[in-house]
A protein has these predicted regions:
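S-adenosyl-L-methionine
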Residues: 1-23
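Conserved class I S-adenosyl-L-methionine
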Residues: 25-34
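Class I SAM-dependent methyltransferase SAM/SAH-binding core
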Residues: 35-75
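A short acidic, Gly/Pro-enriched loop at the edge of an enzyme's catalytic core
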Residues: 78-87
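Helix-to-beta-strand junctions that scaffold the AdoMet/dcAdoMet cofactor pocket
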Residues: 106-108
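Conserved beta-strand signature within the Rossmann-like core of class I S-adenosyl-L-methionine
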Residues: 110-119
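Short alpha-helix
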Residues: 131-145, 150
């Protein structure tokens, strides 16, 4: 049993690894933010943060960090229509009808950091419904119009889970020189 308090979980190693790619000081959206572990991370790096979750208790907990929006994004309208962010972070959440809204929320030169459960997870735990598990290569397909900087798909042992994760940039550079995306800090 975990001794970490709910809402105090550490930043995802994937999110931490790629945070340096976000433009300095850009606004960051944490979608399905829960109790704000990634909002805390980006706020500590000097980013203004916006979190969306349907749980009013979670939103109350994160409201001191930045903009906190309580919304049922699966059954209601997208609450950020017309707004864009330099960083969009999604972890442990999948609702396919939102793909176009998520991608439209990414500003030019903005970075998408996405990590969630994948096919095979049903053999080791929850979530196990196919609706909540990415199919092989699905994030690559969704991000085909973005510049993919990193992608992983596979199994992690502690705790056991099948994951798919991607870091992708909405490039605005039309120069002949390719943009350098550092693979580490």
């Amino acid at each position: 049993m975990s001794t970490v308090l709910h809402g105090q979980e550490p930043t995802s190693s994937w999110v931490a690894r790629w945070s340096h790619l976000l433009p300095a000081g850009c606004q960051v959206l944490d979608l399905a933010c829960g109790h704000g572990r990634h909002m805390r991370h980006f706020a500590s790096l000097g980013h203004p943060v916006t979190g969306i979750d349907r749980n009013p208790d979670a939103i109350a907990a994160v409201s001191p960090l930045g903009e906190a929006i309580c919304a049922d994004i699966e059954n209601g309208p997208w609450p950020l229509k017309g707004r864009t962010f330099g960083g969009v972070v999604v972890t442990n959440y999948l609702w396919r009808p939102l793909w176009s809204d998520i991608l439209a929320s990414l500003a030019p030169d903005g970075v998408l950091i996405y990590e969630t459960f994948a096919a095979g997870n049903d053999t080791v735990g929850k979530p196990s419904r196919p609706d909540f598990l990415l199919q092989p290569g699905e994030l690559l397909t969704v991000c085909q119009d973005l510049r993919v900087v990193a992608f992983e798909e596979g199994f992690l042992a502690q705790p056991e889970r099948f994951l798919q994760r991607i870091v992708a940039v909405r490039e605005s550079n039309n120069a002949q020189t390719p943009v350098r995306y550092p693979l580490s800090r």
